[in-house]
């Protein structure tokens, strides 16, 4: 049987991790996620593979080439514009011929028994068979309700808990027949989940769901990415981690120095520098040519190629993209991400889920509660001459900026806050007061309720 890997995704929710590469090229234990999918297909004797591409296609083709080094044959089909899942597969029909074939996403992580699904599809003589997975948190996925024979009865897209009639989610892995693809229009976008499968259901054509046991994860965002890493280190998914296991829970491509603290599980690639007193793990992934400084802490975090964590810096649940660095005494909290070549300067603190886009900087000593993206942040707000923060209303200065300023100023105690009698000033004052926490019991300022607007002709703008 032939297969189609859908690898055209941009990975918007995975940013900034996916900004430099298409989503299927996201590194996972030193290799792109899509390489793990190719290994899975080969394990089930599927070696003739089409790859559909759209976003940054050349990076995929340059890395994998013909597929010969992996023992497979890859044929690429590039979309000039997005055609939907079924539309992209339609482009491959000239290569697929008149045989049934398997479709799988290039950015999922799984070890499901694809052979079992193929056999079930053939026994049912199905037009299309959906691989299903019993998910403990089904709200983020499309649910598939089947009868006792496995025939699909209906779909429920991203339900509320009141709509959860099953925990069987659509994995995006399908076995399709030419009969099913005949319903895909020759032109324009067309989607499997929104268009093709409802049409098959409406026309009462054989449409089945095959639940499989094992591991499956949609690597949709940075949190899911870290969860996949932790599950792999825990052995919950069958995956070749590509380097030797030197002791229980410790994978390392190099000998490890004395004077460091390792808490398993950890994965450490070659050409890594671990300085004395470094604390690594649990759930730490350190890619090649990385450096972890003296008494730095890296826990539940992923360091991609060529990154640095300086002395006494602390990472807990963070991701460092290639070329980025966390300088001395900086702190990156759960969900923080440094994009390619981004920098957290000395003493900077990135709070939960704060992300720096590629090339951005968190200045020394700052405390960031919001992400910095290219074009949306001209720098951290500083008090300039005369104790004034200057900026353009709605661009440099907005409610989110004042919330952050208020959260910092209110830490030391009560702070007086006034404003001019203009709508913009009142808006910023309310945001600044809101950032300071609950109102004090007595007195004003310090994060209390916003000040009343002054009478007309009151104090001039600050």
Functional labels for PLM-detected ranges:
Residues 1-61:
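N-terminal glycine-rich phosphate-binding loop and ensuing alpha1 helix
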Residues 9, 34, 60, 76, ...:
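Buried hydrophobic positions in well-ordered alpha/beta secondary-structure cores of metabolic enzymes
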Residues 60-148, 183-185:
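Conserved beta-loop-beta/alpha segment of the NTase-like Rossmann-fold superfamily
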Residues 100-102, 109, 115-122, 135-138, ...:
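Catalytic-core segments of class I nucleotidyltransferases/pyrophosphorylases
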Residues 188, 202-299, 303:
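Extended, small-residue-rich solenoid/repeat segments and analogous flexible loops
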Residues 294-389, 393-394, 403:
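Glycine-rich hexapeptide-repeat left-handed beta-helix
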Residues 378-431:
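An N-terminal, well-structured beta->alpha segment
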Residues 415-435, 440-442, 455-457, 462:
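N-terminal small/polar loop signature for handling phosphorylated ligands or for N-terminal nucleophile
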């Amino acid at each position: 049987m032939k297969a189609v890997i859908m690898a055209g995704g941009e990975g918007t929710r995975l940013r900034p991790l996916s900004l430099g590469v298409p989503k299927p090229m996201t590194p996972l234990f030193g290799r792109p996620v899509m390489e793990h999918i190719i290994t899975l297909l080969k394990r089930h004797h599927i070696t003739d593979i089409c790859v559909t591409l759209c976003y940054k296609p050349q990076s995929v083709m340059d890395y994998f080439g013909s597929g010969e080094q992996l023992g497979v044959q890859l044929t690429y089909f590039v979309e000039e514009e997005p055609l939907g899942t079924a539309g992209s597969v339609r482009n491959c029909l000239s290569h697929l011929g008149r045989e049934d074939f398997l479709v799988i996403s290039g950015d999922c992580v799984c070890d499901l028994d694809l052979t079992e699904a193929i056999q079930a599809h053939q026994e049912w003589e199905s037009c299309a068979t959906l691989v299903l997975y019993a998910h403990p948190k089904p709200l983020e996925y499309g649910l598939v309700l089947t009868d006792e024979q496995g025939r699909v009865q209906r779909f429920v897209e991203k339900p509320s808990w009141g709509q959860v009639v099953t925990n069987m989610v659509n994995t995006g892995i399908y076995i399709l027949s030419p009969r099913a693809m005949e319903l895909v229009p020759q032109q324009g976008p067309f989607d499997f989940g929104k268009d093709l499968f409802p049409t098959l259901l409406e026309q009462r054509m054989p449409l089945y769901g095959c639940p499989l046991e094992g591991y499956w994860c949609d690597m949709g965002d940075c949190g899911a990415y870290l969860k996949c890493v932790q599950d792999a280190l825990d052995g919950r998914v069958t995956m070749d981690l590509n380097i030797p296991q030197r002791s229980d829970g410790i994978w390392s491509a190099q000998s490890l120095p004395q004077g460091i603290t390792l808490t398993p599980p950890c994965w450490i690639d070659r050409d890594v520098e671990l300085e004395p007193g470094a604390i690594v793990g649990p759930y730490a992934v350190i890619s090649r040519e990385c450096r972890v400084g003296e008494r730095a802490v890296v826990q539940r975090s992923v360091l991609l190629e060529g990154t640095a964590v300086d002395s006494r810096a602390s990472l807990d649940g963070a991701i460092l993209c290639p070329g980025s660095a966390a300088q001395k005494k900086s702190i990156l909290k759960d969900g923080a991400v440094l994009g390619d070549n981004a920098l957290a300067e000395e003493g900077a603190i990135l709070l939960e889920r704060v992300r720096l886009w590629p090339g951005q900087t968190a200045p020394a000593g700052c405390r960031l509660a919001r992400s910095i993206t290219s074009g949306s942040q001209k720098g951290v707000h500083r008090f300039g001459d005369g104790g004034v923060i200057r900026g353009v209303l709605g661009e440099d200065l907005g409610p989110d900026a004042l919330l952050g300023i208020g959260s910092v100023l209110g830490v030391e105690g009560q702070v007086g806050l006034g404003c001019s009698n203009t709508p913009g000033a009142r808006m910023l004052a309310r945001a600044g007061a809101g950032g300071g926490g609950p109102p004090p019991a007595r007195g004003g300022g310090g994060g209390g309720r916003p000040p009343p607007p002054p009478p007309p002709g009151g104090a001039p703008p600050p």
